[in-house]
Amino acid sequence: MLSKDEKERLRGLSKEHAENVGLHMLAAYSIEEEEPELALEHAKWIARQASRIDLARETLAFIAYRQGDYKLALKEFRTAYRMNGYLDYLPFMADCERGLGNPRKAIEVASSEESKQLQGDAKAEMFLVYAGALGDLGLWDKAIETVHTLSLAKGLSGGYRMRAVQAEQNFLEQNGRSEDALALEPLLDKLEAQYADEDDEESSQDVAVDYDLEKLSDSKLEQIGIEAEDGGFRRRS
């Protein structure tokens, strides 16, 4: 069943057409894992039939993204973004650039003025994408520093803390620092036991891993975009 917000976003269509689009949307999401190709066809139909509705383009963008069709996903995310200016698309747009083999473009998106306005989980997602793009370019030290600093943020949800440590371990291995990567195993085991199978409904005050950000320099925090005073995420204008 569509949420109240989703129904509201379909109000530009006639009642009958909105119901049809909604049914195809539900079908696309319900069969996405078992029949991805058919789900994508449903999403394409939605985008064709409701091309001026941002939710329709968003639906196709996310389904294409999860199936690795980054060219189509990027096109649809850009279209939806032009329609509604929804900043939380930006990390996915940057990751699409990575998927298309354009890490420098991903970094441009991550470093844009619009991305500086991201908050919470969307901001954390962008840092992970940014770090991945640095890794794509072989800039392992910068990639490691980014995810390590991210993992220390006290306002970070447990799921993103886990992903940051996973990324750090992967980058360390890629950089030939196997012993350092292995040293993260106990911490990662703890985080994965807590968060690997949970939905993303976690408290912003999560303190599963208690690090002290005061040990990091203000300049490093400024570079990564984390508030030095409280270790939380901040909006930079």
Language model features with spans:
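Eukaryotic alpha-helical solenoid repeat scaffolds
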Residues: M1-D5, D141-A153, S157-S237
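Solenoid-like repeat scaffolds
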Residues: L10-E16, K44-S51, R78-G85, S112-G120, ...
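Alpha-helical segment of the N-proximal tetratricopeptide repeat
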Residues: G12-R48, T59
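TPR alpha-solenoid repeat register
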Residues: L23, A56, Y89-L90, M126, ...
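Structural motif corresponding to the intra-repeat A-B loop/turn of tetratricopeptide repeats
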Residues: E32-E34, Q67, L100, L137, ...
